[in-house]
Swiss-Prot record:
Membership in a protein family: Belongs to the cytochrome P450 family.
GO terms under cellular component: membrane
Source organism per UniProt: Aspergillus violaceofuscus (strain CBS 115571)
Official protein name in the record: Cytochrome P450 monooxygenase pyvB
Pathway in which the depicted protein is active: Secondary metabolite biosynthesis
Gene3D superfamilies on file: Cytochrome P450
Keywords from the UniProt entry: Heme, Iron, Membrane, Metal-binding, Monooxygenase, Oxidoreductase, Transmembrane, Transmembrane helix
The encoding gene: pyvB
Purpose: The subsequent chain release by Dieckmann condensation (DKC) could be catalyzed by the TE domain present at the C-terminus of pyvA and/or the alpha/beta hydrolase pyvD, installing the tetramic acid moiety.
Length: 487
């Protein structure tokens, strides 16, 4: 959560004496900038002003972002600002403003800038200047029909191997083991068989080391030119990933005939004239993709497994439907279950950074450049005026939708935001979908599953939003699976 990252430096100062004077100086400059009156401040959206002046809103946002945004909406309406320690954030609430938010062009409000708030430290300087070109290449490279068909075969193969291993271990932590499965699929499909055969484990270590440091408060508080341990570790892991990438690409070029018809995404970007000249940024691109494709896909699969255990009637219905649909990608009950998980367990915030001033409410409010603008997929998905009984996982809502439900994910509504909306949909939607479909279909078809020895989690509302993407369950949950007995 951005609030925690921007505020928590205060509690680290005594533990980081070598950086205290630098941090304090930066804070003073930032606070002066925040309180200095400007013309745009006269047209700024209202702030809820909870608690202690200047820091009360930020502290409340840090402590419980969902509750804060709900209370701020009640007090201020659908547009309000949150004065964070080193940034100003404007929050937009409601389907109408969601639609406007997703339709604003990238050169005005930047999704790339929002991603960069968290991931700029793991990318080579200059990478985000080419983000649009590289993201567009995902549609051409990953979403090719031949590529997706090939990827699904690999996914089913990896699912079979992963689940066989789960079945031999008694009980496994769902999120942790799903994380390993998703990583194997991402490396094999997007990077290629050579990365999978020779670099899989080291890449997983790099991913987790980066996850541990990416949210360090100094990475968000301090300018890039001020060194500190977390930034140095990120730089070391970033450079190691680049070394691995360059070594594997060099090996490929010594044996080009092997890779001539390869469907992996690295091969595509190296050969496509629109991206080949950006080879120096491709290591950063694939580092960012590891984060973007990993966290939310793990959440989608893991939460669906837990909800199927909690809803045995739907699990039985899903088994029957999978028996009637040899291609899991066409199984309505499976697609509905995954979609409902995407609604129920979505990320709290979506961020964009502003490059140009934008007026809201007919000029009543002005959002200036260099601010952050946010909407909440989580609160949109839990709005009872949009979704009936939103606090419950009910995949049937997608199987027999009324007219309102059928329109939720079109540009006019922007009420279902798992993969964005309007002209800003996630280009990895298809791949994330087949990864989830492949593992879940294999699990339900071939295995029976029960809770681990600890039983079901005592609190499935203990959501961990600390990662970049959809929440995981705090403390994880264990399950045991065993092969189904042939009938």
């Amino acid at each position: 959560m951005i609030a925690s990252h921007l505020l928590s430096p205060l509690i680290f100062l005594e533990q980081q004496p070598a950086y205290s004077s630098v941090v304090i100086g930066a804070l003073v400059v930032c606070l002066v900038c925040l309180v200095w009156p400007t013309e745009s401040a006269k047209r700024a959206p209202p702030a809820p002003n909870f608690g202690v002046p200047r820091i009360g809103d930020a502290a409340a946002f840090l402590a419980d972002p969902v509750s804060f945004v709900q209370k701020a909406t009640q007090k201020c309406g659908s547009i309000f600002q949150i004065k964070l320690l080193v940034a100003n954030l404007v929050y937009l609430r409601g389907v109408k403003l969601n639609r406007m938010y997703t339709d604003v062009k990238e050169d005005t409000w930047s999704f790339g800038g929002g991603i960069g708030l968290f991931l700029r430290k793991i990318a080579k300087p200059g990478y985000f200047d080419h983000l649009r070109t590289l993201v567009n290449s995902l549609n051409r490279g990953v979403n090719r029909k031949a590529a997706l068909e090939h990827y699904f075969q690999l996914i089913e193969e990896e699912a079979g191997k992963a689940l066989q291993g789960w079945s031999q271990r008694g009980a496994v932590p769902v999120f942790e083991e799903t994380s390993r499965f998703v990583h194997r699929v991402i490396v094999r499909c997007l990077m290629g068989q050579d990365f999978y055969d020779h670099r899989l484990d080291e890449l997983y270590e790099i991913l987790h080391h980066m996850e541990a440091d990416i949210g360090h408060p100094f990475n968000l508080l301090l300018p890039d030119w001020i060194p500190h341990p977390a930034a140095r570790r990120l730089e070391q892991n970033r450079d190691r990933f680049a070394q691995i990438f360059e070594q594997q690409v060099a090996d490929r070029r010594r044996n080009p005939e092997i890779w001539r018809d390869s469907l992996d995404y690295i091969s595509f970007t190296l050969e496509d004239p629109r991206t080949a000249h950006l080879e120096g940024y491709l290591p950063s691109h694939h580092t960012v993709l590891m984060f973007a494709a990993h966290t939310s896909t793990v959440a989608s699969i893991s939460w669906t497994i837990l909800e199927l255990l909690r809803n045995p009637d739907y699990l039985a219905q899903l088994r029957q439907s999978l028996a009637a649909h040899p291609d899991a990608r066409k199984c309505p009950e499976l697609l509905a279950g995954i979609k409902e998980t995407g609604r129920h367990y979505s990320g709290v915030h979506m961020f964009r950074t502003t490059h140009r001033a934008v007026e809201l409410e007919g000029g009543k409010y002005l959002v200036p450049p260099n601010w952050i603008v946010s909407i909440s997929p989580y609160l949109t998905h839990h709005d009872p005026e949009i979704f009936h009984t939103p606090q419950h996982w009910i995949p049937e809502r997608w199987l027999q939708p009324d007219d309102r439900m059928q329109n939720l994910n079109n540009p006019r509504e922007a009420a279902f935001l798992q993969f964005g909306a309007g002209c800003h949909r996630c280009p990895g939607e298809a791949l994330a979908g087949i990864i989830a479909q492949g593992l879940l279909a294999t699990l339900v078809r071939r295995y029976d599953m029960v809770w681990g020895k600890e039983g079901p989690p005592t609190d499935l509302t203990a959501l961990d939003f600390s990662k970049v993407g959809s929440p995981w369950l705090e403390g994880d949950a264990s399950i045991a699976i065993r092969p189904k007995v042939a009938e």
